[in-house]
């Protein structure tokens, strides 16, 4: 979850305006539990007309949220992003300790039918004014949640234990090349050489692609990978 300066938006056009001026008299960071997204990833099977995402306001005051989907380019404002999804509602007010469902519906598209496509769901939580802030100049910070959205064409298997059979590891110089022969995006949290973790960061490999990985050591007789399945579980196996 990232904290960003809140930028007010036009509810009619849902257009983001400029950043608040930094020339302010005070900056207030109120305690606010905020809105959370249930789950760590969204799988959208092509045969589904829509999928529902559950949000929860864990704060003790109501919050205003703005939700949108992007294709990985975070430089564009929401109103300029073009993705083949309709999200309802894009703006909503959630009461304290209350939930809200957001519906994602696929639109006519030209997405690949032989492999998954990746997008991202963003939820911007705009905190309310506290009684202490009323009438004061304050910089409010909005909290943004962003999780992966995988669009899965018909006939493509889920990410599970069988996915390991589609992963190949080869030495390359001082590093490794991991080949993903599956039609899924695969997220690898751990690469272990002789049961010692050697990767520096989480790796995400596109379907039917290979990726070079920097590791602390590639001198091993066997490799164990830990991947994240459809449900956000960490599963490991020997490669």
From Swiss-Prot:
Disruption phenotype: Deletion of the operon under classical laboratory conditions does not result in any major effect on E.coli capacity to form biofilms compared with the wild-type strain. GO terms for molecular function: protein folding chaperone. One of its GO terms (cellular component) is outer membrane-bounded periplasmic space. It holds the Pfam family PapD_C. Keywords: Chaperone, Fimbrium biogenesis, Immunoglobulin domain, Periplasm, Signal. Residues 1-31 form the signal peptide. One of its GO terms (biological process) is chaperone-mediated protein folding. It comes from the Bacteria. It is found in: Periplasm. Induction: Expression is negatively regulated by H-NS and subjected to cAMP receptor protein (CRP)-mediated catabolite repression. The operon is cryptic under classical laboratory conditions, but is functional when constitutively expressed. Belongs to the periplasmic pilus chaperone family. Part of the yehABCD fimbrial operon. Could contribute to adhesion to various surfaces in specific environmental niches. This is Probable fimbrial chaperone YehC. It comes from Escherichia coli (strain K12). The gene is yehC.
């Amino acid at each position: 979850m990232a904290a960003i300066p809140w930028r007010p938006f036009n509810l009619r056009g849902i257009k983001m305006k400029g950043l608040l001026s930094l020339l302010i008299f005070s900056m207030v960071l109120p305690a606010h539990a905020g809105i959370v997204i249930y789950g760590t990833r969204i799988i959208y099977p092509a045969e589904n007309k829509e999928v529902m995402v559950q949000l929860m306001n864990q704060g003790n005051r109501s919050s205003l949220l703005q939700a949108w989907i992007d294709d990985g380019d975070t430089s564009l404002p929401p109103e300029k992003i073009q993705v083949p999804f309709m999200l309802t509602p894009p703006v909503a007010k959630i009461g304290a300790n209350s939930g809200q469902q957001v519906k994602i519906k696929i639109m006519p598209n030209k997405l690949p039918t032989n492999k998954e496509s990746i997008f991202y769901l963003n939820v911007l939580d705009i905190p309310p004014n506290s009684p202490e802030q009323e009438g004061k100049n304050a910089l409010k910070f909005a909290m943004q949640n962003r999780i992966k959205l995988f669009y899965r064409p018909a006939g493509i298997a889920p990410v599970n234990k069988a996915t390991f059979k589609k992963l190949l590891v080869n030495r390359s110089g001082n590093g490794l090349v991991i080949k993903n022969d599956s039609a899924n995006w695969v997220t690898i949290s751990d690469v272990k050489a002789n049961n010692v973790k050697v990767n520096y960061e989480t790796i995400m490999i596109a379907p039917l692609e290979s990726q070079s990985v920097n590791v602390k050591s590639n001198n091993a007789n066997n490799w164990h990978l830990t991947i994240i399945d459809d449900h956000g579980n960490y599963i490991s196996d020997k490669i």
